[in-house]
Design a protein with these regions (language model features):
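Hydrophobic faces of well-ordered beta-strands that scaffold small-molecule active sites
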Residues: 19-23, 54-56, 94-98, 164-166, ...
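Short acidic/histidine-rich active-site segments
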Residues: 59, 246-262
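His/Asp/Glu-enriched short active-site or ligand-binding loop at hydrolase and phosphoryl-transfer sites
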Residues: 215-227
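Acidic-and-aromatic substrate-binding clefts and catalytic sites of carbohydrate-active enzymes
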Residues: 33, 63, 172-173, 199-203, ...
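An N-terminally biased module of ancient metal coordination in phosphate/nucleic-acid-related enzymes
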Residues: 1-86, 90-91, 134, 150
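Short active-site-adjacent structural elements
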Residues: 226-230, 237, 256-262
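Extended substrate/RNA-proximal surfaces in nucleic-acid metabolism proteins
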Residues: 2, 66-141, 148-216
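Non-catalytic positions within long, well-ordered alpha-helices that form the structural scaffold/packing
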Residues: 47, 185, 241-242
Length: 266
């Protein structure tokens, strides 16, 4: 009941570029949108909130063995062809990345070199005062107002340094997880840890701050700031935000219903 009465969170402040940097709207590939119709509903919901684009971040993990980069690119191409036929949606920019679980299969994914990364220019935002942009990415972000990429899966025009969105299990730290983060850095990418504030059972807030100090970028869930995941998660998210430790935010929407429940406003 308390969640219903909470004030709505302004996206203009937390997504100044108008791009949802984490959502599961690519239909039928993971625990997100189940159909193209539902995915289109999510996009319309994002547009109603004033968003101009989204980065699709389907899971790559053992639970979804079919989710190889090649398969996801194919599914993304099919979905964007559907989106482009929707006159009501208009010029909504879609990009494809992935959310990689740091599990036993991750070292093989990284070694393959075929990764679905996030290009900083996709965020289409100058560096806002409440976000922490790692050194080397600020210039790319400052140039994003000139970007006109749409429905992109290509590496053409990408910035040199890329974000690789990764996540941890909620209940148990995997063996070698810090070594995996180091290997991402060694490969020339910036690890972008998804929803760090939600890892209450496995990491303390001090651990998150230590990761940020090591060059690990943090991506918050907007729902964490509205109390969607509970008061403890909200408190950690507010603390990290106050100290400018977040690099990006995303809705992490898995359905249109979830997007509505996040209590967001333009």
């Amino acid at each position: 009941m308390l969640r219903f009465f909470q004030p709505r969170l302004s996206l203009r402040r937390h997504l100044p570029g108008g791009v949802d940097a984490h959502c599961h709207l690519l239909p039928g590939v993971d625990d997100g949108a189940e159909s193209a119709e539902e995915a289109l509903s999510i996009i319309r919901g994002q547009q109603a909130l004033g968003l101009r684009g989204a980065i699709c971040t389907p899971h790559i993990m053992a639970r979804y063995p079919q989710n190889t980069p090649a398969y996801l690119r194919e599914q993304f191409a099919q979905f964007t062809s559907i989106v482009n036929r929707q006159s009501s949606i208009g010029n909504f920019r879609l990009h494809l990345a992935a959310e990689y679980m740091l599990d036993e299969a991750f070292p093989r994914h990284l070694a393959s070199g075929d990764l679905l990364t996030i290009d900083p220019v996709w965020l289409t935002q100058p560096q806002p005062p409440n976000l922490n942009i790692p050194e080397g990415l600020g210039v790319a972000l400052a140039e994003t107002g000139k970007s006109n990429i749409q429905n992109s899966t290509s590496s053409i025009g990408q910035s040199t340094q890329q974000f690789l969105l990764v996540e941890l299990p909620q209940y148990l730290l995997p063996p070698g997880w810090q070594d995996m983060l180091d290997s991402i850095l060694a490969a020339g990418h910036t690890p972008l840890l998804a929803h760090p504030e939600r890892y209450l059972r496995i990491l303390e807030e001090g651990d998150l701050r230590a990761l940020a100090a090591r060059g690990i970028a943090l991506q918050g869930n907007l729902g964490s700031l509205t109390g969607y995941y509970g008061s403890r998660v909200k408190a950690i998210a507010q603390s990290l935000l106050a100290d400018k430790l977040y690099t990006t935010f995303g809705t992490d929407s898995h359905s249109y219903g979830m997007l509505r429940q996040l209590k967001l406003t333009a």
